[in-house]
Amino acid sequence: METYRIAGYFKNKCILITGSTGFLAKIFVEKVLRAQPDVKKLFLLVRASDATSAKQRVQNEVIGKELFTVLEEKHGRGFHSFIEEKVFPVAGDIVHENLGIEDSILTELWKDIDFVVNVAATTSFNERYDVAMNVNVLGAKNVLEFAKRCAYVAGEMEGLIPEKPFSMGETLNGNSHLDIQEEINFVQERKKELQADKSTERIEKITMKELGMKRARHFGWPNTYVFTKAMGEMLLGHLRGDLPLVIIRPTIITSIYKDPLPGWMEKTRTIDSFIIGYAKGKLTCSLGNPKLTMDVIPGDMVVNAMIVAMAAYLNNQSEIIYHISSSMRNPVAFSILQLCVYQYFSKHPRTGKDGKTIKTRKVPMFRNLASFHTYMVLRYKLPLEVLHLLDLILCRSISHRCNELRQMYNFIVRLAELYAPYTFFKGCFEDINSRRLWMAMMKDNTEEIPLLDFDPKSIDWEDYFNNIHIPGVLKHLCN
C-alpha cells in the first residue's frame, strides 16, 4: 500500500454499488462520500421499474436515512446539491444479464466505472433455493461479467478456517463433487415439476425452502445462504480471468461500533433475535454452548475493511480473500452476550403490551438437544395440552392464552433450529490477510485509523453490547 491517504485512491473515481438499499451498502456509500467528497460518481443499482422509481427508492431508503445525518450536517445547505452531483441511482437487478440496466446508459457505465462493489444478496438462512440461487450464485456471475466490460476495472467446520478461495466443486464434508450447473438445472427442473402439478404458491415456497436446506446440508453447509454464497464465490474465482477480485467474508454483522452513528442498524440479524425475544419476554431458554465463541463484527468495521482492501488491491490482477472477523484476535463467548442482556434489562426493564413490567430472568442455554426438548415439553407442550382441554371445556374463553403460549413455543424452537449451526460452531476464522492489511495501514496511514478502523482488538465487548448494540437493537428493531 503506497504511503498516502487511502481516501485518495477514490478521488475522481466512479464506483458501481449493487444491493445499494441494504445495510452494508448504505454504510459504504455514506463512508465514501464523507471520507472522499472528491469521488467522481457513485452509481447505486436498485430494483426499480424506471429511473424515476430508482431515484425515489434511493432517496427514501438510502439518503433519507438517519445514517446520513452526520454527512448532512457536514455539508449544511449544500447537502442535497452534493448528493445530486455524486449519487446516481440506476434501475436494474443483478439476476439479469447486464444487471438489467437499460441499453441507453450501459456504454456510459462501462466507460466510466473504476470499481464494482457487489453487496447484493439474499441473506435469509432458509431462503427459497431458487431465489438464493438466482441472487447469490447467478447474480454474482452477472456482476462479474458486467465488471469485465468496464474499461477501468482490470460452513460446518471446526478448527482454523483459512482465508483461501473455494475450489470449483469443493464441498465441506467430502460428500461427492459439487457441480454448480447441475444444481442450477436441478432447482429449475424441480420448480417446473411444481408448476406442472399446479402447486399453490405456499407449497412451492415451502418446497423450495426445504430443498435449499437439504442441498446445503448434503454438501456440508449449514444453510441455504452460506451454501449459495460459497457457490457464487466459486464461480467468481473460476470465471474472473485477470480481473482483480477482492472477496470480503464478514462473520455475523452487528450494529455500527463507532462511525457515524454507534448502534445504528437495519433488519434483525442472528444475535438480535435473541435480544428481541428477551426484550419481549418471549425467550425463556436457548440452545447452544455458552462457552463457545460467537464470531461477530460491527458493520462499520466491515465497510472500513472493504474500503482499505479496495485501495490496497487496486492494481493487482489476482484474487484475495479477507476474513473480517473477531474470533482470532478478540473472541467473545455467548456467555458474555447472555450476561450483558441480563444486566441491561435488569437496569432497564421493559413494559409488555399489557402494561406490566416484563420480569428480568436469567435464560438457560442448553448444550444438547435432549435437555432442550425435555425443557420445552415440560415448559410448553404439556401445559399447552392441558390449556387446550380447559379451553374446550370453558368454551374458548382462554384461547388467547393458548395462542400466546403456542407462539412462544414456536418462536423458541424456530430460533434454536435456525441458529444451532452457529451456537454450536467450533471454528475460528483465520485472518492473516486482514491482519496484514491492518498492519500496512497502521504503518503508512496512521492519520486515517480513526476513520477506517477495522481492528477487532479495539472492541470492549461488554461495553459494546451494554452501551451500543443492545440499545441500538431496541431503538431500531424492537417496535
Residue ranges and their predicted role:
Residues 261-284, 405:
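C-terminal beta-strand-loop-alpha-helix "lid" module of Rossmann-like NAD(P)-dependent dehydrogenases
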Residues 193-263, 271, 315-322, 327:
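Conserved beta-loop-beta element that borders a ligand/cofactor-binding pocket
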Residues 115, 127-148, 154, 168:
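NAD(P)-cofactor binding segment of oxidoreductase domains
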Residues 1-122, 129, 155-201, 224:
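N-terminal Rossmann/SDR dinucleotide-binding element
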